[in-house]
């Protein structure tokens, strides 16, 4: 069965088969984790993303990882938090489902997720963490090629949320 674990640190340094990028709809880079991934991957990533012609909220697209340790970058566009009554939970869950499906299609054995929509998109951290954990745990039997799913936390507060929801041992750093 697929192992789900928590790791606190810089997602761009993880040696996994695929990392997920919490992108904006243009896929051309932005702030937060999106900007960090684009900077670490190099200019080739922007060129590859231009060919994808953007991405809708809740969907996902894949490129090579270029200068990253990860072979692939899965770009997904999370919802902007608008109070919770505008389909945000389903759109966020869809980001995880579609990203996992692309990881499996690419033959990835390991995939790492940032906290999608938790930066400038303003999703409440507790709710976002619960959706992330629920979706990766629900989807893992369906994605048999995946041996490891890593939930990457940007700080100890988010790491502790994931850890509590997973009921797991201390966070790796």
UniProtKB/Swiss-Prot annotation:
GO molecular function, one term: O-acetyl-ADP-ribose deacetylase activity
Family: Belongs to the MacroD-type family.
SMART domains, alphabetized: A1pp
One family name in Pfam for this protein: Macro
Segments forming domain Macro: 1-170
Designated name of the protein: Macro domain-containing protein PA3693
Organism: Pseudomonas aeruginosa (strain ATCC 15692 / DSM 22644 / CIP 104116 / JCM 14847 / LMG 12228 / 1C / PRS 101 / PAO1)
NCBIfam families recorded: PRK00431.1-6
Domain of life from the UniProt record: Bacteria
CDD domains (alphabetical): Macro_OAADPr_deacetylase (cd02908)
């Amino acid at each position: 069965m697929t192992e789900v674990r928590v790791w606190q640190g810089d997602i761009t340094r993880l040696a996994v088969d695929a990392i997920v990028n919490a992108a904006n709809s243009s896929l051309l880079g932005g702030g937060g984790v999106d900007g960090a991934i684009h900077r670490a991957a190099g200019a080739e990533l922007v060129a590859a993303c231009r060919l994808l012609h953007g991405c809708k909220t809740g969907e996902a697209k894949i490129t090579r990882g270029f200068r990253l340790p990860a072979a692939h970058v899965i770009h997904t566009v999370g919802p902007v938090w608008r109070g919770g009554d505008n389909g945000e939970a389903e759109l966020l869950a869809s980001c995880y489902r579609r990203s996992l499906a692309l990881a499996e299609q690419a033959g990835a054995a390991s995939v790492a997720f940032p906290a999608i929509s938790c930066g400038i998109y303003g999703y409440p951290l507790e709710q976002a963490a619960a959706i992330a954990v629920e979706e990766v745990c629900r989807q893992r039997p369906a994605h048999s090629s995946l041996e490891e799913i890593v939930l990457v936390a940007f700080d100890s507060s988010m790491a502790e949320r994931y850890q509590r929801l997973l009921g797991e041992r201390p966070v790796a750093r």
